[in-house]
């Protein structure tokens, strides 16, 4: 049952990120200070690590993405 819940949450989160990338991101233009972009990072983190750890990694990344942070490469950890 827990695996089913994880798969459902993963699907919902990935859909939300894909929806953002397709419908909202083109209007805002490139704003992320990191490579890969925050939405790509979130998609990869959730795909690799599941909804809980991947979601936490994504939230940490989003909290670091602001004008006072230096730009750079920030890949998803293994």
From Swiss-Prot:
UniProt keyword annotations, A-Z: Cell inner membrane, Cell membrane, Membrane
Q: Indicate how the chain sits in the lipid bilayer.
A: Peripheral membrane protein
Does the record carry Ubl conjugation as a key word? no
Q: Which cellular component terms (GO) are annotated to the entry? A: plasma membrane
Q: Which domain of life is it from?
A: Bacteria
Q: Where in the cell does this protein reside?
A: Cell inner membrane
Q: What does this protein do?
A: Could be involved in insertion of integral membrane proteins into the membrane.
Q: Sorted alphabetically, which NCBIfam families does this protein's record hold?
A: membrane protein insertion efficiency factor YidD
Task: Indicate the family of this protein.
Answer: Belongs to the UPF0161 family.
Protein name, entry field? Putative membrane protein insertion efficiency factor
């Amino acid at each position: 049952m827990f695996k089913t819940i994880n798969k459902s949450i993963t699907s919902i989160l990935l859909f939300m990120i894909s929806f953002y990338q397709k419908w909202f991101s083109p209007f805002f233009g490139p704003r992320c200070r990191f490579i890969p972009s925050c939405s790509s990072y979130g998609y990869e983190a959730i795909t690799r690590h599941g909804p809980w750890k991947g979601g936490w990694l994504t939230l940490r990344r989003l909290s670091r993405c602001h004008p006072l942070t230096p730009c750079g490469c920030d890949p998803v950890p293994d």
